[in-house]
Amino acid sequence: MGASSPRSPEPVGPPAPGLPFCCGGSLLAVVVLLALPVAWGQCNAPEWLPFARPTNLTDEFEFPIGTYLNYECRPGYSGRPFSIICLKNSVWTGAKDRCRRKSCRNPPDPVNGMVHVIKGIQFGSQIKYSCTKGYRLIGSSSATCIISGDTVIWDNETPICDRIPCGLPPTITNGDFISTNRENFHYGSVVTYRCNPGSGGRKVFELVGEPSIYCTSNDDQVGIWSGPAPQCIIPNKCTPPNVENGILVSDNRSLFSLNEVVEFRCQPGFVMKGPRRVKCQALNKWEPELPSCSRVCQPPPDVLHAERTQRDKDNFSPGQEVFYSCEPGYDLRGAASMRCTPQGDWSPAAPTCEVKSCDDFMGQLLNGRVLFPVNLQLGAKVDFVCDEGFQLKGSSASYCVLAGMESLWNSSVPVCEQIFCPSPPVIPNGRHTGKPLEVFPFGKTVNYTCDPHPDRGTSFDLIGESTIRCTSDPQGNGVWSSPAPRCGILGHCQAPDHFLFAKLKTQTNASDFPIGTSLKYECRPEYYGRPFSITCLDNLVWSSPKDVCKRKSCKTPPDPVNGMVHVITDIQVGSRINYSCTTGHRLIGHSSAECILSGNAAHWSTKPPICQRIPCGLPPTIANGDFISTNRENFHYGSVVTYRCNPGSGGRKVFELVGEPSIYCTSNDDQVGIWSGPAPQCIIPNKCTPPNVENGILVSDNRSLFSLNEVVEFRCQPGFVMKGPRRVKCQALNKWEPELPSCSRVCQPPPDVLHAERTQRDKDNFSPGQEVFYSCEPGYDLRGAASMRCTPQGDWSPAAPTCEVKSCDDFMGQLLNGRVLFPVNLQLGAKVDFVCDEGFQLKGSSASYCVLAGMESLWNSSVPVCEQIFCPSPPVIPNGRHTGKPLEVFPFGKAVNYTCDPHPDRGTSFDLIGESTIRCTSDPQGNGVWSSPAPRCGILGHCQAPDHFLFAKLKTQTNASDFPIGTSLKYECRPEYYGRPFSITCLDNLVWSSPKDVCKRKSCKTPPDPVNGMVHVITDIQVGSRINYSCTTGHRLIGHSSAECILSGNTAHWSTKPPICQRIPCGLPPTIANGDFISTNRENFHYGSVVTYRCNLGSRGRKVFELVGEPSIYCTSNDDQVGIWSGPAPQCIIPNKCTPPNVENGILVSDNRSLFSLNEVVEFRCQPGFVMKGPRRVKCQALNKWEPELPSCSRVCQPPPEILHGEHTPSHQDNFSPGQEVFYSCEPGYDLRGAASLHCTPQGDWSPEAPRCAVKSCDDFLGQLPHGRVLFPLNLQLGAKVSFVCDEGFRLKGSSVSHCVLVGMRSLWNNSVPVCEHIFCPNPPAILNGRHTGTPSGDIPYGKEISYTCDPHPDRGMTFNLIGESTIRCTSDPHGNGVWSSPAPRCELSVRAGHCKTPEQFPFASPTIPINDFEFPVGTSLNYECRPGYFGKMFSISCLENLVWSSVEDNCRRKSCGPPPEPFNGMVHINTDTQFGSTVNYSCNEGFRLIGSPSTTCLVSGNNVTWDKKAPICEIISCEPPPTISNGDFYSNNRTSFHNGTVVTYQCHTGPDGEQLFELVGERSIYCTSKDDQVGVWSSPPPRCISTNKCTAPEVENAIRVPGNRSFFSLTEIIRFRCQPGFVMVGSHTVQCQTNGRWGPKLPHCSRVCQPPPEILHGEHTLSHQDNFSPGQEVFYSCEPSYDLRGAASLHCTPQGDWSPEAPRCTVKSCDDFLGQLPHGRVLLPLNLQLGAKVSFVCDEGFRLKGRSASHCVLAGMKALWNSSVPVCEQIFCPNPPAILNGRHTGTPFGDIPYGKEISYACDTHPDRGMTFNLIGESSIRCTSDPQGNGVWSSPAPRCELSVPAACPHPPKIQNGHYIGGHVSLYLPGMTISYICDPGYLLVGKGFIFCTDQGIWSQLDHYCKEVNCSFPLFMNGISKELEMKKVYHYGDYVTLKCEDGYTLEGSPWSQCQADDRWDPPLAKCTSRTHDALIVGTLSGTIFFILLIIFLSWIILKHRKGNNAHENPKEVAIHLHSQGGSSVHPRTLQTNEENSRVLP
């Protein structure tokens, strides 16, 4: 996409120095935009727009804030091009309605049809055509608006509606049809038939049928006639009748007359049904109804094991019947008869004879299901399956077997016991939601979370399933659904679980493995399969090795003959099978076998057994009778023998058969056969045989027979006692009444048992049957039977029990990362210790004791957790650093090294004071601490103030903060400690000496254990510690349960006295009517005392009452304080009687009697103010039970309390029944504190207390901000704000605040802790002709100063001045980016004139007068005023001497709009500030939607600033009314409005008496929420109320359900799924209806199979060898080196059979955008940035490249990087241009000439000399460069050559003078002639002339002036005699003489010279008084002058000699004056050889 950056709406800063304003702003905008993603964030790639496309495509995924993307409308849409902008909130501006779909023309209705516009006629829309009734559509029935070129058209032409045609109507005999058109017939055309008339128009034929038919259509395409045509027949005639399969016997004529009879017969193989003859009636009808001919039936089918009637017939007529009957032993299934049908078939289907079946199995399985077999025949099996969560206890099946002569079920219904799981595993560094003593039933879920560790700086991640569920293994034991997760640090997998089926190929001791590690496994010997490997995945879980190794199996075991095999689980190795025989057979051999491994094969451990029929011995013989049997020798199980008595003579009956006449062979142990009962007797009627009593003696005569009513008496043998009546009477049928007595031995007292009590201690003798009961003392378990019975043999049975000390079960817990230390035994008081490995700390109890809990011995604490010890982040030290990383975890043993920062720039060196290495260790409490304090970086010589000691204090307080080496500080122990005073000293290593173990904490005395109790020392017994007391089970604590070690004076003692442990007493046990209790002590009853009840006996010891209830109760306690009895006492009642039922607060409506008879019904009602729960009527059952369960009368509850900011459901009710619940919920933003539900108690109160709604609070903000501060609010409620502020020199990366916000139903901090990054500045800018003190190594830290200087160029003769600040400092801009404090200065060539350039434009101010100049002299002032949006006074800037404008900081400030209004229920987000140009954003609280603009900007309005938009409104999000459900309703406190957070609770309708009719399936409560913060939706679908034990029809996509046409299914019903073609099933094919309307197992799903994933160029994917992939399978792509993966790294096979997402591609690695800039040059970027790409650097003309000319994209490790940075473009300078003889150039003498500068040459002019020079060569040369970039001149310098003109004439003469030199013949240009004057004349002016190039002499401007010497008018002391003239001429002499008293000083004579002076100078006359002094002074002066003259003369001579040598070609022409006077010679010079440059 074309990404462009807009101009910032507000200027960010001045443009870069040296750039014009237009360019500087753009450059700065680019820089700002490049910085924005870091500072403010970025936008992701915008969504694909269906109506528009980007003008330029790009592969970018992220775009900086402020980026523009340009779009144009797609074909089919109209609109202008537009742009979207990435806003500061990282959201793209909207593009809605920018492009509108083009419209096709309005489609016309087809004739006789219409067009249906579905959704408009715009691009992409579709229209439909239809025809009016009777017309058919010719053409396309629809059209779509599509693109065609630049417009849109309909893709199909308008169709035609053609009238539906019909063919010709059918013709009829003797008639015709009438129609308006006889050729064309269309839809709706009607034709009417009529019969042809006879001659004369008479009616001959009758029209029979519909007279009119019409043209219609069934498919709107083809026309058909509405019915058959009528017929025209002669009246009273009939057409021939037609009988299918029949033959007309009569003549077959075309017509039959009225009343004519015809006859039929059927074709062969058919029989007739109906009349053979029919008669012709009026209107062509035959009567009676025509017959039918039906086929004859063949003989019916034979049925196995059945007979049928009429076996002798071969043919059967329709309607004939046959009857079936089965053989004996079989039941007839189906109809007993079949009938022959007219079609020749038998109906109904033939029956079958099936083996007899058992009756329906009537047993019910509570909490389970009974699975019935297909049939109930012999051998049929009924299976018992428990519901999910229950395990089977008992037989899993019942078989239909033959028992005697009957078929019965061989076992009863088992029991389904609820499954419970052990306590969920404890995990290190984590916790679960289970409670310590909680019970975990099947289905219970437990959630795991990891502990936060802000003190360690460590965050743990939960690896594995966060939720585990209590489920079961195949054996029905409770197990957790998956292993407990673990809390670990991401990046490694723990060691994998041990596999039962496989083992590692190579063993390893590693405990963790990096992601991607693979471990190779091979199957164990009991399994088979290929080797495989598992891999540590990215989610830190090992890949699954399911179904890799399969368990070897044995062969399917055969059923033994007359037996069966029971496969318990399967037939794999290790499994066991059981054998059993059918009833009546015994098992010979092994009853079980195990599948074992032998070598590599699996086989059964034993051979199958044999089932042998159980034999019986001969049946008993009887006197006077015999038995009858089919076989009198062999008798087996089931054989029946029948007895009969011998008849008398003549066959008369003599004996009576007394007893069962038949007995059968059976078995009690399935091994030995016995007869079912004693044989009967054959006795004489009304006689009895002698009665037999074992160990008894018949006192009466012992005869062989006794008469009716005769009485006999018994007594027992010595040593035996009688039980029962002594006398019995002979009754009819040889019976004695009452029942015969028994004689049993007498028992001695039973044995005493140690630590036990027994009942009936006061008795010496015990009758047989008498029982004694044993009970153990508390803390002991009874081993053996609890009671002993006196046997008839005089012994006690069974053996006496023993009382053993109670023991706890084996301690099964494992301690990960620790050890469990076991005791010698596990008896009460035993202790298991837990010790953690080094580096781990114990979380939980350090020991578990075996204690007595109630009557059980249990371990009092579960396994603790050994959590790894972590240390907090090591302390940060000023001026130093450590080797720890910012987010590193510091486990036990980790070492950290400290070093001090080097500060060479500061001139400071710090030394590390203290230990340089500290190690993570632990304190006595197991907390992670560092081995020593962190060192410090300081300047040597002083210790810092010592740490505060908990155990000691300074003797003398001091405020000093540092102390010199050697300082000692004195300490004394604090009151809680004891020890001598001590001192610490500041050592040479600047650390204080250690005061270890100087003061020790005072301790209390060791507390004694109370009797029957124990003391628990929590930590120690030192001052401040606490101990707890507890009593052993059965004792209560009297006194204080804890004590603290406190200080009193100087002594430590316990705060309270030890308590007393008193045995818990119980009151007297309850008394019962008609019974009493037995106990060793009937007065005192304590915890553990057991009493046993028994009922009183009637007269003679007979049993009168039945004991109903628990016979024994024991003393226990619920609160360890008050003793109570374990349950109610039993009752002694008369059998089949009930005591009056008692209902609290209930009234018995029936008569209140003491006893009620069996099945008697009583009725209750409740007292006023109470409501009944349960049945009103109950019935007396056996054992004193009333059924159904008694009702209860409970108080009515008033409405529950209302709570602020909360509501409860139901809320509309006035009265609440006991047990009813109400549910509380809070408004959004509030948390419920307390119980969520209250229930109405039977006392009429609500329990527990009502909750309250508190404003939601976020958890403590635990994040730390290194190099910054976290500013906390006053509270942590919703809306609270935590601010983050970085220290100076650091910038915030991330959000500057974190708000406590509502997310869903939780309150969370919306941002995590940001990072404070060190601010760095880029390398300081390089300047031309200058340098800085910065290093080239990289970024410069905040605060660093850089100095600039200009380069010296003495070789160039140039000097540069530094313009700007010479020092810049690394500081930061408002966004935290590192910037330099001011622009870099520049080095400008020093020039005399000083000007400032045009000042930069200020964003905040404008000049009062427009600026048009480009340069301003030093001192110029410009006046400015603030722009709109800013305020401040007018100010001015001045051009300073350093050619920089004066500073303008803080002159104008942005105006403020003030705080923006905060919307109610929302908040304002101030991004930067509220000043002009700033933007603030609005957001609404959770549950509210924003109406209005989400942002507003502070803009100019008039002379002020204001927010451009009003604050939006936060409107609460509402939901539609919650969905209604069948058979149920919802409760809510408001049924009209449903706002966000509103909770509604559903419940199902109940029956009239409150009984449950429906089951609520699904979430009981749903709440109003929102997915887009705009529209309210309900959190989930509502639950359903379905019939109890019913399931709704499950739906599986792409599957077919069998059966599929029902909406409800019954409990345990099974349905099957199969997938549609092309789909595969994942999951179970069958599911079963479970309770709660659920299907189990989980519903399957049908997914398409995926083909292999696509191959990609330069890449590969995993699982490349696989052909088919199941849904959910993943493949992972990777690229070859040098290629990057673009797209998703993994694809997964979707249920639709596709791969998702799209396959990635491998693109050549690319370098990042090359962001470097090249001042004075260009960066040439390549077409792409892939590896090998080259960025070239080209300097602008006049600059040369210093550095590399290109940077290549190269591979460095795994990253693509540019291999060189940006070079520098230096300005090119040329050396000074060459000088030329007789010429000059325009260059300056100041130094180098810049590139491009042109220099012009010209030849010197010499008009005075008369010479002219010509320029030979280029007159201009330009500074350019050679290929190496050096400055060179464009061409060589030119030269000046003399032009040769005409010679000059003879030189002119002058007055009083002449030229010297001889006369020459030719005077050439350039020749010089010198002139001299005659003696007495002096030359004035130039003394020469020269010949010019024009051939004339230069101007003669000299002359000869006469020489005159002046004489002073007055001379002191001169002789007056002398006559002096005023003027003397050249050559004149004067002589001087002085007057007396004067002395002549000087020469007495002097001559007038040619230069108008006297030589020697005129003398003076001086007074003689000063002669000596004057003479001395003059002499010295003269000598000094002469010396100087002499030296000067020597030097001059030397120079002249040199000049003579330098000019050997000079010609001197001496022209002497005529007078012979000495004159200075003049020289005539020539330039004939151009050897000298003229002056």
Swiss-Prot record:
Report the record's disulfide bonds.
C43-C86, C73-C99, C104-C145, C131-C161, C166-C215, C195-C232, C238-C280, C266-C293, C297-C340, C326-C353, C358-C400, C386-C416, C421-C470, C450-C487, C493-C536, C523-C549, C554-C595, C581-C611, C616-C665, C645-C682, C688-C730, C716-C743, C747-C790, C776-C803, C808-C850, C836-C866, C871-C920, C900-C937, C943-C986, C973-C999, C1004-C1045, C1031-C1061, C1066-C1115, C1095-C1132, C1138-C1180, C1166-C1193, C1197-C1240, C1226-C1253, C1258-C1300, C1286-C1316, C1321-C1370, C1350-C1387, C1396-C1439, C1426-C1452, C1457-C1498, C1484-C1514, C1519-C1568, C1548-C1585, C1591-C1633, C1619-C1646, C1650-C1693, C1679-C1706, C1711-C1753, C1739-C1769, C1774-C1823, C1803-C1840, C1848-C1891, C1877-C1904, C1909-C1952, C1938-C1965
Topology: which residues are Extracellular? 42-1971
Tell me where in this chain the PTM Pyrrolidone carboxylic acid is found.
Answer: Q42
Q: What is this protein called?
A: Complement receptor type 1
Q: Can you name the source organism? A: Homo sapiens (Human)
**Job of this protein:** Membrane immune adherence receptor that plays a critical role in the capture and clearance of complement-opsonized pathogens by erythrocytes and monocytes/macrophages. Mediates the binding by these cells of particles and immune complexes that have activated complement to eliminate them from the circulation. Also acts in the inhibition of spontaneous complement activation by impairing the formation and function of the alternative and classical pathway C3/C5 convertases, and by serving as a cofactor for the cleavage by factor I of C3b to iC3b, C3c and C3d,g, and of C4b to C4c and C4d. (Microbial infection) Acts as a receptor for Epstein-Barr virus.
Q: Which GO terms describe its biological process?
A: ATP export; complement activation, alternative pathway; complement activation, classical pathway; complement receptor mediated signaling pathway; immune complex clearance by erythrocytes; negative regulation of activation of membrane attack complex; negative regulation of complement activation; negative regulation of complement activation, alternative pathway
* Record key words, sorted: Blood group antigen, Complement pathway, Disulfide bond, Glycoprotein, Host cell receptor for virus entry, Host-virus interaction, Immunity, Innate immunity, Membrane, Pyrrolidone carboxylic acid, Receptor, Repeat, Signal, Sushi, Transmembrane, Transmembrane helix
Annotated glycan sites:
56, 252, 410, 447, 509, 578, 702, 860, 897, 959, 1028, 1152, 1310, 1481, 1504, 1534, 1540, 1605, 1763, 1908
Cite the residue spans of the region called Disordered. Answer: 2017-2039
User: Residues on the Cytoplasmic side?
Assistant: 1997-2039
What PROSITE patterns has UniProt attached to this entry?
Answer: SUSHI (PS50923)
